[in-house]
Amino acid sequence: MRLSYISLTIAIIFVMAIVHAPETEAKAYPEADAVAEAIAVGEADAVGVADPGFKSMLAKAALKILKAVAPAAAAAIADKIG
């Protein structure tokens, strides 16, 4: 068998394995779902709020980069922002 047919052969074997694989059905356990939901609700309160100054810090960094790349465009944007 030539080297160019190896990838085609592997692809055909892979497809045949998927087509002829035994079908399985997932079983849902309501107790596990209830516990997972309770854990998720309990942990949701522990998540902190993002720093409100993050957007302004990101905008300042983007403006610095823009000043280095295109000073005229940066000046126009800085005038619009204020």
UniProtKB/Swiss-Prot annotation:
GO cellular-component term (any): extracellular region
Keyword Nucleotide-binding: no
GO terms classed as biological process: venom-mediated paralysis in another organism
Similarity-based family: Belongs to the formicidae venom precursor-01 superfamily.
Keywords: Amidation, Antimicrobial, Secreted, Signal, Toxin
Superkingdom classification of source: Eukaryota
Any GO molecular function: toxin activity
Record Pfam families: Pilosulin
Protein name: U10-myrmicitoxin-Mri1a
Compartment(s): Secreted
Signal sequence, start to end: 1-26
Predominant location: secreted
InterPro entries recorded: Pilosulin
Tissues where this protein is expressed: Expressed by the venom gland.
Propeptide: 27-52
Post-translational modification Isoleucine amide, affected residues: I81
Function (record text): Induces paralysis after injection into blowflies (L.caesar). In most cases is not lethal 24 hours after injection, but paralysis is irreversible. May have antimicrobial properties, like most ant linear peptides.
